[in-house]
Amino acid sequence: MCPYRLDPEGADTHGETARLREQGPIARVELQDGVLAWSVHDYAVAKQIMADERFSKNPRKNWPAYINGEISNGWPLITWVAMDTMATQDGADHARLRKLLLKAFTERRVESMRPHIEKTVKELLDNMAAKADDEIVDIKEMFHAELPTRLMCDLFGVPEERRAEVLAGGHKNIDTRISSEAAEANLGQWQEAISDLVEYKRHHPGDDLTSALIEARDEGSRLSDSELIGTLHLLLGAGSETLVNALAHSSLALLVDADLRKKVTSGEIPWVNVWEETLRVESPVAHLPFRYATEDFEIGGVKISKGDPLLVDFAGIGRDPAVHSDAPDEFDALRPDKTHLSFGHGVHYCLGARLAKHAWMIGIPALFERFPDMELAVRRDELKGQGSFVVNGHASLPVHLKGRAAALAR
């Protein structure tokens, strides 16, 4: 069977998964520039792969095409490969890098951030409330994207005047429509922006994670310059995207289902149910690059060759009919089993999962309490995709904050 070419536009994430599922638990896919890989969308097989040491995260040791120079700096997915981060390391090196960040994401540390998160949420909601009643507001831009990026930039001590250039690389990093020229330029510009941030923080240290990482580097913790830069790339770039789309997808679910919204806001259905079901039915991440086979073997009924790259289709895993036999594509906040793998599994489980949930549990209830009459300003089928097969999201989420009636009354 011919490889299935993933759509760089990401226009039909779940439709693609349905077509791939017809080929079995793992399907052959074609990426940009004809690069071949495997996509796994089966829950059991994906969980096995994420815990199997025969799959490495390190392309520098295990992807022949990259090692041999066949993958250029202009490849649209190059930043997922070239960056030296804990997401591209295995074993002791991965553990060493992860350990440097663990203290920042403990339950106690995350809970201590509550006042700051609440203050940030209030500021964002106040900004939205200042809009005219008849003005259409993109809540993805003004709230869903702003909350995570502000929190991450605050956590890492990124000065306000440097945030735009630091965050720009992350936005381009998930855009799978990007041209070769733009991809290569982004790789260089993003590295330069992060390097400039590190140099600034060396001279202006603070009580933040960037300063702590620099101190660890300078005190001989075996953190290399490339690892320092790569770690900041990972957390300031991709680090906030999961929460951005989790916020947006859950808001959309509540906007299109008045009965669900009433039951949740009244307390009949717990908010945490919406959080978990959102992660299951609309995983914020779609096809996440990459894992690499370190030997030949068979899994999921297919033969994987040594060096083959693999993407995990998190958007498909949560809808696996073998796990969720009862209407897996439907959002059901009362579903007894909301099993998903949206934050990963095994040693690479998302470090920021606890913080993401904490921010969501503060932000989304506050959003719907502040704007109880909020309505979509377009039909659901008019919402456009984000332009990526790496993440699962919409380009925007336009609403009338006080409802259509208030807008029409102006």
From Swiss-Prot:
Question: Which GO terms are recorded in the biological process aspect for this UniProt protein?
Answer: antibiotic biosynthetic process
Enzyme class, top EC level, equals oxidoreductase
Which of this chain's residues are annotated to bind heme? Answer: 350
Does the keyword section mention Metal-binding?
Answer: yes
Catalytic reaction annotation = 2-hydroxy-5-methyl-1-naphthoate + 2 reduced [2Fe-2S]-[ferredoxin] + O2 + 2 H(+) = 2,7-dihydroxy-5-methyl-1-naphthoate + 2 oxidized [2Fe-2S]-[ferredoxin] + H2O
Q: What is its EC number?
A: 1.14.15.31
Pathway assignment reads: Antibiotic biosynthesis
Query: Which is an annotated GO molecular function term of this record?
Result: monooxygenase activity
**CDD domains recorded:** CYP107-like
Described by its record, this protein's role is as follows: Involved in the biosynthesis of the naphthoic acid (NA) moiety in the chromophore of the enedyine antitumor antibiotic neocarzinostatin (NCS).
Q: What is this protein called?
A: 2-hydroxy-5-methyl-1-naphthoate 7-hydroxylase
The top of its lineage is: Bacteria, Bacillati, Actinomycetota, Actinomycetes, Kitasatosporales
Gene name linked to the record: ncsB3
